[in-house]
Structures are given as C-alpha cells and as structure tokens.
C-alpha cells in the first residue's frame, strides 16, 4: 500500500494550481499468523516436541520421562522406562518407531536391570501419543499408543552428550546427491549413581549399550527404501554386601540389618532389523511393505544368601541406648537361586496402504507374524527362621515342632521348574475410513474402522489352539463455528489384547494355550479449549473415559515384573478424568500442569470387586520451564510428579483379597539448570564457539527433596509372634548429575 497525503490549497479565481504528489509505499505490520492443524486434536492424539526431551531432567532422560508428566500416565519407579496408562499395566502399551512395533526384554524384574529404552531420543523427529480411544490402524493392545518417527537428515550433524550416567554419539548426513540419508546413534548407560544411593551397599557393575541406525534411500520419485536396525547388550552384575533399613512409627521404630553373600549376573542381548519399501503409486495412493525380525537372548542367573536381624529400636529420648537396637524380634536367613534362560525370535511381514481423495482417506493393512520362544525356568527360594526351614504354604501337613520331631524332607518355600517351547502364528488386518467436512458452519472429522486378529498357539507339542477376534472402533470430532476456539470429540470401540508369551505362562511356569484375549469396551469424551492469556497461547485439554473390562487375566506386580495367573477369570472396569493445561507461563517456553483421577477394580471368580494393582486414584504432574530475565541463556527445568499409592508390596504368594494395603505415595521433583553457550538462535562466526552448532552444559538434581519412595517390600518373620513385617525397599535418594551437550 501507499501512505495517504492530505494538503490544503488556497487560490484566487481563474488561477491554475499544479500538484504532482509522489506517494510513498507503506508497509503494514500484521499480527502474528498462526496456522493450526487440528487433525491430531480431533484424533485425541497428544503431540510432543522432540527438542523438549533433551532438556527435561529425569533419571531416565528420554521420551518416557516426558510421558510421565501427562495425565493418565504413571510410573512409580524412576529407574524404569515402563509406564501404566489409565489403569492398564506395562504390557498394554503399543510402541511404534516409523510404523514398526517395538518389543522389550521379557525377564527384567527390576528397574535397575532395564538399561536403555529402545527409543533413542536424539534421533527422534515426531512424537504422537494416545492414552486411549485410538484408531483401528494401531494394533491390538488395551491402553495406549506411542508413535515415534525418526529423522531423515538434511545435512551433516554430529551430536555428543556426556554425563555421570553415561553418554551418546549421534551422526547424521546425506549422500548420493541427497538420495541417501543416514542417522546412526550409539549410547552407553551406567546406573551405578542411582543404585549406590540406596540403602544397600553393593558392588555394582552395569553395562548398558546399544547402537541404532536409520537409513533411507530414494530410489526414484515413486520408490523409497528404508532400514531401521538396533543392537543392544545389557550386562547386569550385582553383588549386594549389606543393608540397613529403619522403618515403623516414631513410637515403635524397627531396624532391619541384612548381610549378603553371593551375586547376580544377568545378560540381555537383543537385535532388531526392519526393511521397508514405500511406493507412491500416484498423488492419492501410497503403499508400504515391511519385513521385520526381532531376537532376544536373555539370561538371569543369581545365587544370593541373606542373613537378617529384625530388632526393636530404643525410642526413649532420655535413655543411654537411644537409637540403638535393644531387642531382636526376628533372626533368619534365605537363599534365592535362579537359572533362567529365554530365546525369542519374532518375525513379521506386513503391507499397509493409504488412499487420499479430497477430504476422504482410506487406510488398510494386513500382517503375518511368527513367534518362536524357548524358555527354561529354574528358580527357588529357601527361608530359614531361627534354625527352622519354612515350608511352602497349604501342603496339608501338621508341623508342631519342637514338641514332636518332624522328619519330612526340606522343601523350598517357592520352587518353579519348567521348560517351554512356544510357537505362535498371527494373521491380522485392518480397514478404516476417515473424512473431513462440515455440518452447517461447523467443521467435523470422523473415522470408522475395524480390526481382525487370528492366532494359533502350539506349546510343548500339545494340540494347536486357534482363536479369532474382531475389534470395531470409531471417532467423531466437531469444531463449532464459535468465537471461542473449542473442539469436542468422542471415540471408542472394542479393544482386545490377544495373549503374548507372558500372559500364557502361569505362576508355576506352565504354558496354557487356551487363554483368551482380554477385552475392553472403551468410551472417551474430550474437549480442547485454546485461549490467550497475557497475549500468550494456552490450551486446556479435558477427557473423561470409561472401560468395561472382560476376560481379565489377573496378575501381580513385583517392582516391574508382572506375573499372570494365566486364567481369564475376572471382570472389571476403569473410569476417570484427565486434565492438562499447557501454554507459555513464561514467554517463549511451553510448560504444563496435568491432573489425573482414576478408579479401576476387578472381580476375580465372583468374589467381589477389589482394587486392581494399577489403581492409582490421583496423579499430578508439572513440567515447568523458565529462564533468568537478565541472562536468558541460563535456563531452568522442573519435573514434578505426585502419584497416590497403589495396592502392592504383598508377598508373591498372597491372596489379593486378603492384602489390599497400598504402597506409600510416590513423590518426586527433579530440577535441571542449563546454560546455552550457543544454539540456532545464537551463532558465532569467529572464536571457539564458532565450531559448534550447539553447546550446552548443566546440572541436574534428581529427587531434590530426598523423598524416600518405595514400590516393593522385603518380608521378614518374627519368630516369637509368627508375624511378618513388610520392610520397604526404598528407591534412589538425592543425586547430583553433571551433563554436557555438543552439536557440530
């Protein structure tokens, strides 16, 4: 446009006035234009920014740490990357990388054994997460979907990270006139810092290492070849020495002292490879064919003897023995032995397609999968209390020592011996239709789809068992043509989870081939309200949900180890509400507050409803980012989580109807302080910093309030009263970590 000119003239009659103005151009500064894609919101998918992963403090720095701050997602063990979603367990979550389903090791029983998550956060481009009500194109699990896309590099970049917990190197580049792109990452992790902060003195030598590669080659305008590979070697050498734990009340404190002998040596070797071909037939149709192989070889070997003394602590402040153990309530020992081996090979081939025409989209796919699992279990526990070997429960004999001698053989308190060979074949497919349009002036999205899954199980040369399920699913969303920016959505359907290896194996190690798929009839109502405060964007997301659960396979949880009854003898439900407010509480930095309310119960063998192991009634998560106003390169990050206690801590043999005690609430705050020397917004053309695309250094304070969290108990016996005491096994305390990041 041009600037306007206004000029007054005064003239006599018949005079001629010549005026030749030159208009000057004028630039009008428009307000910020925001282009929004509401498709993910309409699908109930939470999109997270990949760059946040690198800076959020957490014991496991990665995508899972970010997920724990979302409503409905919980984990009460900072050393584990596994998580529960809306009343589900760890095994009910789907994880995809570039459209390929990812599997985890099977034998891991504690968070400190896990090592690295499969997902290398430095290689991530996009993160999409759904806590329920997801579309038919995703697989057959009950709870959630985490859909990760790795980067396709555009130029050379090398990223190096190092801290007291380990380090990583990632290199990415393009070749062959940018037809070939490659990104390769190597990581190393050492959990010694966390394990040594516990109340158990140990000799601990963990070695968690993995290497990943993602290559993409554009053969032509229509054909692109991709390869995703992973190799992981986790070695866990653990030698406990002593333990001292005080617990109880102020007026009745107790102390447990344990002396250990023995060691544990575990090895988890996993390899994974996936080759895919994308074929862009035309502007409307895209086809993808993928071949995948996953192999895990796991060894869990340990012989650990423990001798303990449970004593009363003098709580009399005026006493000369104040704070000392004055009376022993229980003396005993136990020996734990394990020689467990597992070898699993999972291969599959699938074809997926997408057809788009105008505002219509059709997605379809078919998949065949073969699972071959060989498993050997040799695991037993002997408990001795004051010279008497404690026998297993409910063996139908009378032992009234010392009044009458008992001459029966010594038997382990727990004993599992099994050897299994398992072959599972699966055929699955899906078809779904999506459309965008209008109802009057209101924008709408809808999706309808169906999945089918057939599987056959052959265990230990027994007769093959065949089963088949169908899962219809649907979504509908509307964005009214209102002055306020609000989107409403509803989704639901039938979500079934066919049994995998762990669900088929009972407490005794026996494989039961006829276990049915667990089923959830799921309904989700949600809304997104986008608004502005302080001239900064905010969004309030609210969802309420209900799950009607049937064919439940009851389970118990010990740390991160899930043991199933291998019996579809329960029904249940899960209901709750999730609220998340995210926005720029500090200009230019997104933060959020999450609130989750949940209730989930189950009825086993019609004995009545009790809380499920994942019944976490309340969850609060806060992710806050800030910077120093006069020094904006100095940034602070706070990751705060509060989870109410869940039922747990019971002995492995306990009847859940007799043990509904809850563990203590999980409370944790991690603080990170980072200084950015240079990054994309602050580059140097000369000097030392000109060599870097990015250079950062910082400190992380984990569990900054040094709160004692516990997720399991050690059970010891009082010989005098025959009572058992649950001694909490505390997680990590306050830890300081130093880290540095470089990008070239």
Language model regions located:
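Membrane-embedded beta-barrel scaffold of Gram-negative outer-membrane proteins
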Residues: 288-292, 489, 517-575, 697-702, ...
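Face-selective signature of the C-terminal outer-membrane beta-barrel domain
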Residues: 218-233, 263-460, 541-544, 592
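Gram-negative outer-membrane beta-barrel transporters
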Residues: 439-444, 546-548, 567-650, 739-743
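Transmembrane beta-barrel wall of Gram-negative outer-membrane proteins
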Residues: 159, 165-188, 201-240, 263-295, ...
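Short acidic/polar hinge/loop motifs at secondary-structure boundaries
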Residues: 55, 101-129
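C-terminal beta-signal and adjacent terminal beta-strands/loops
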Residues: 588-591, 641-651, 675-744
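Short, acidic, small-residue-rich periplasmic hinge/interaction motif at the N-terminus
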Residues: 12-60, 90-92, 98
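Extracytoplasmic beta-strand/coil segments of soluble accessory domains associated
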Residues: 64-104
């Amino acid at each position: 446009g041009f600037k306007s000119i206004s000029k007054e003239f005064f003239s006599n009659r018949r005079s001629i006035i010549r005026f030749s103005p030159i208009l000057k151009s004028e630039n009008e500064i428009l307000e910020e234009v925001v282009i929004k894609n509401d498709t993910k919101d309409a699908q109930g998918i939470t999109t997270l920014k990949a760059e946040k992963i690198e800076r959020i403090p957490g014991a496991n720095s990665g995508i899972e740490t970010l997920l724990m701050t979302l409503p409905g997602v919980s984990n009460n063990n900072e050393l584990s990357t596994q998580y529960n979603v809306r009343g589900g367990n760890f095994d009910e979550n789907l994880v995809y990388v570039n459209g390929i389903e990812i599997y985890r090791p099977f034998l891991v029983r504690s968070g400190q054994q896990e090592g690295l998550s499969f997902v290398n956060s430095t290689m991530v481009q996009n993160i999409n997460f759904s806590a329920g009500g997801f579309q038919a194109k995703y697989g057959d699990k009950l709870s959630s979907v985490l859909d990760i896309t790795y980067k396709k590099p555009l130029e050379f970049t090398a990223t190096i990270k190092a801290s007291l917990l380990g380090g990583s190197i990632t290199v990415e580049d393009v070749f062959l006139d940018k037809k070939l792109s490659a990104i390769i990452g190597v990581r190393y992790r050492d959990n010694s810092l966390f394990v040594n902060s516990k109340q158990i003195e140990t000799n601990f030598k963990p070695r968690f290492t993995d290497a990943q590669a993602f290559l993409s080659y554009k053969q032509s305008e229509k054909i692109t070849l991709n390869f995703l590979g992973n190799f992981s070697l986790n070695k866990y050498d653990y030698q406990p020495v002593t333990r001292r734990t005080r617990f109880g009340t102020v007026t009745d404190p107790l102390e447990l002292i344990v002396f250990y002998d023995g060691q544990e040596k575990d090895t988890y070797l996993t390899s994974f490879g996936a080759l895919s071909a994308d074929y862009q037939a035309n502007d409307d149709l895209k086809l993808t064919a993928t071949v995948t192989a996953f192999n895990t070889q796991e060894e869990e070997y340990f012989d650990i003897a423990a001798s303990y003394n449970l004593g009363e602590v003098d709580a009399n402040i005026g006493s000369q023995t104040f704070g000392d153990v004055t009376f022993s309530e229980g003396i005993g020992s136990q020996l734990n032995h394990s020689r467990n081996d597992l070898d699993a090979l999972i291969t599959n081939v699938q074809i997926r397609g997408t057809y788009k025409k105008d505002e219509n989209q059709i997605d379809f796919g078919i998949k065949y999968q073969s699972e071959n699992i060989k498993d050997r279990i040799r695991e037993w526990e002997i408990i001795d209390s004051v010279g008497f070997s404690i026998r297993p429960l409910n063996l139908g004999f009378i032992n009234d020592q010392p009044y009458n001698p008992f001459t029966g053989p010594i038997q382990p308190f727990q004993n599992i011996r099994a050897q299994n060979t398992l072959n599972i074949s699966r055929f699955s497919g899906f078809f779904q239709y999506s459309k965008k349009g209008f109802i009057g002036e209101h924008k709408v999205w809808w999706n309808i789809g169906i999945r089918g899954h057939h599987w056959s199980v052959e265990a230990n040369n027994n007769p093959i068992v065949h089963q088949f399920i169908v899962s219809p699913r649907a979504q509908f969303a509307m964005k009214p043509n209102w002055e306020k920016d609000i989107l409403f959505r509803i989704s639901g359907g039938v979500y079934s989870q066919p049994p995998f290896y762990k669900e088929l194996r009972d407490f005794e190690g026996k494989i039961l081939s006829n276990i049915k798929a667990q089923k959830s009839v799921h309904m989700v109502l949600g809304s997104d309200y986008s608004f502005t405060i302080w001239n900064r964007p905010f969004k309030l997301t609210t969802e309420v949900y209900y799950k009607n659960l049937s064919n439940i396979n009851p389970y118990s949880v010990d740390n991160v180890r899930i043991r199933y009854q291998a019996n579809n003898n329960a029904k249940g439900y899960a209901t709750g509400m999730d609220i998340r407010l995210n926005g720029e509480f500090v200009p230019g930095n997104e933060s959020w507050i999450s609130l989750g309310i949940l209730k989930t119960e189950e009825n086993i063998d019609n004995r009545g409803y009790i809380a499920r192991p994942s019944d976490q009634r309340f969850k609060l998560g806060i992710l806050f980012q800030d910077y120093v106003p006069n020094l904006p390169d100095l940034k602070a990050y706070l990751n705060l989580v509060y989870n109410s206690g869940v039922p747990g801590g019971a002995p492995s043999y306990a009847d859940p109807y007799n043990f509904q005690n809850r563990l203590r609430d999980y409370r944790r705050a991690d603080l990170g302080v980072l200084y950015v020397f240079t990054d994309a917004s602050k580059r140097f053309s000369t000097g030392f910093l000109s060599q870097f695309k990015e250079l950062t250094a910082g400190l992380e304070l984990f569990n900054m309030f040094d709160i004692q969290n516990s997720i399991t108990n050690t059970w010891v016996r009082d010989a005098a009263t025959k009572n058992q005491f649950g001694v909490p096994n505390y997680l990590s305390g306050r830890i300081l970590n130093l880290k540095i990041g470089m990008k070239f």
